[in-house]
Structure formats: C-alpha cells, structure tokens
Amino acid sequence: MKSASTLSSAFLQPAGQTLPASLLALRFDRASALADLVLPSRKTENWKYSAKHLKLTDDMASTLPLDASVETATDMSGYTIVLVNGVVRPQASSYPTLEGLSVQRFRDLSEDDATLAADLMKKSISDQPAKAGSVNLSLLNGARFEDGLLIQLQPGTVVDQPLFVIHHTTANHSGSAYPCILVAAGNNSQL
C-alpha cells in the first residue's frame, strides 16, 4: 500500500527571524503542526473530483524576494497599504495619521501588540475543529509568514476614506508569499 504524502520538509524550515517573540512562537507552533499534515489526494472526499492533486514542491517553499520592485497605482481614491511578496512596504503606502487608528507592520510591533496579533491569529480557521475528510492548509500561512499588518481602530474611530490593502506578488520564479492582515476594530468604528 502506498503511504500518504506529507508536506515537504522544505516547508518546515524556519522563515526570517525579525518578528517579535510571541509571533515567532506562534509561527513555530504552526510549523510543528505541519510536520504531521497529510496532504489530500483524489481519495480525499473534498478533493475527489479535482482534476489535479496538490503539488507543493520544494521550489515553492522558498520565499519570494523581499526586495522585489513593483509599480503602485496612484489613481486610487482612498488610502493604500502595499504588500509585496507578503511584506508591508511603508514607502509605497499612503494611509492617514489619525487619532484612534494604528497601522503597524508585525516586525515593528511592541510585545503587547504582538501578543494581540498572536491571539487574533490563534482564533483563525486553523484552530477550528477539522471536518471529517477535510484538510486544513491554513496552518501553512501561520507557519510561513514573514511579516504582516495589524490595523487597530479604537472605539468610535471613523476613517474618512476607504483603506485599500494591495497585494503584489512577483512571478519571476517559483516561491511563495504568505501575507497576513489582522484588523482589530473597536465598537462603532468605521473603516
């Protein structure tokens, strides 16, 4: 009998280490859970009629270049936050400095804010009980993110224009990016 395929060990290698301690610990926990993840096949009920099986090859495990250049749209009506290959680009972003609004990259978070971000991520779909026959690949995002974005709105805060989060992913070569965006909105806030 053929053994069930599991995720390549290349996906289990640690990513960058520039995050606060609580986010690094969360990422380590998620990566540990991936070690035993059995990948779906055509015999998996939810994948039964899939034309192709899931191929997560070693070259896809590599992180896309963090210094990739992209052109940003300037004709948008509103505020923008730009992520390139899963990493926030403050210099390409345009968002307000407004009392009651906090927009921070994960790597710039204080330990208290990093703990809030980790707690929000722990409430994600990856911590929900899996349905019989389902495969939870959301653990992959929690194990591989390099950076992320925490948007916090205090109660009653109103942002006067839309806030667009723009993801750019370069496709020069194989690899992957794992953007992570968390919004903590207080009562009666508007974004």
Locate the predicted segments by residue.
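Glycine-rich and polybasic anion-binding loops at the starts of cofactor/ligand-binding domains
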Residues: 1-191
